[in-house]
A protein has these predicted regions:
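Short, surface-exposed helix-loop/turn micro-motifs enriched in polar/charged residues
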Residues: 28, 69-70, 77-78, 108, ...
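Alpha-helix C-terminal capping/helix-coil junction sites
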Residues: 59-60, 142, 186
Length: 237
């Protein structure tokens, strides 16, 4: 059963920001890019898309308008909390050091909430980004003994942690039911998200193979999402 309710990622982020100076004696320091490690709990996309290219141009032209947030990760190494894509841009631009604020977290769940809150506030996130990150939240809650047994109760707890509704959490997590092929279609825009959500519903998971077979044997005529939609209608008929 779940223990005492933890604060949401957003309230945690706000409190961390407001109290950082008092709690951590926080100040900005230049840390070597080579000493910064990507956070293994970060499941948000690191694709070199238009948003990333814009970030890289900004870093190249104006430097870092906002400090990277890191936490200690061994001797002279630091795990990124906020700023994965900015650090990635710095690496590509050949920068040797970046401005960082060091923060410490009492446990893994607090660190994850800070990571999620920072990204949700600063980035345009896809439904699949949210699905994968919620999956990580579920795993960490389970590891800490805070995840209840019931699916509904799990979704309610995760909703409270992420400031989302329970229905939204369930909808995102359903996307994890899609197989690799359909996930690829949806992420590349070759399948509408409406169809993706429909095929991700538990009652429709068994239809995925039939839909993919239909698509493989029929001509898209320049409209692949339309073909997928027709395949779904055929499989459900």
């Amino acid at each position: 059963m779940a223990g005492k309710k933890s604060p949401s990622i957003f309230s945690t982020l706000q409190k961390t920001t407001e109290n950082a100076s008092a709690v951590n004696g926080e100040f900005v320091r230049q840390l070597r890019v080579s000493d910064l490690e990507d956070n293994p709990m970060n499941r948000f996309s690191m694709a070199e898309d238009d948003e990333f290219l814009s970030t890289m141009r900004s870093v190249e032209q104006d430097g870092f308008l906002e400090d990277i947030v890191v936490t200690p990760d061994g001797e002279n190494t630091w795990r990124i909390i906020s700023g994965h894509r900015r650090v990635m841009a710095a690496r590509k631009l050949g920068k040797t050091a970046v401005p960082c604020k060091v923060r410490r977290y009492p446990d893994k769940l607090s660190e994850l909430r800070a990571l999620m809150g920072a990204n949700v506030h600063r980035r345009s996130l896809s439904p699949f980004d949210m699905a994968r990150q919620l999956e990580t939240l579920r795993e960490v809650l389970s590891e800490s003994g805070q995840l209840p047994d019931g699916t509904k109760e799990q979704a309610e707890l995760m909703a409270a942690q992420s400031d989302l509704s329970r229905a939204t959490v369930e909808r995102y997590l359903d996307l994890l039911n899609l197989d690799e092929t359909m996930t690829g279609w949806a992420e590349r825009g070759e399948m509408t998200m409406t169809d993706a959500y429909e095929m991700a519903r538990r009652k429709n998971v068994h239809l995925q193979a039939a839909v993919e077979e239909y698509v493989a044997h029929n001509n898209a005529n320049g409209d692949f999402p339309g073909l997928v939609h027709r395949a779904i209608a055929w499989a459900k008929a």
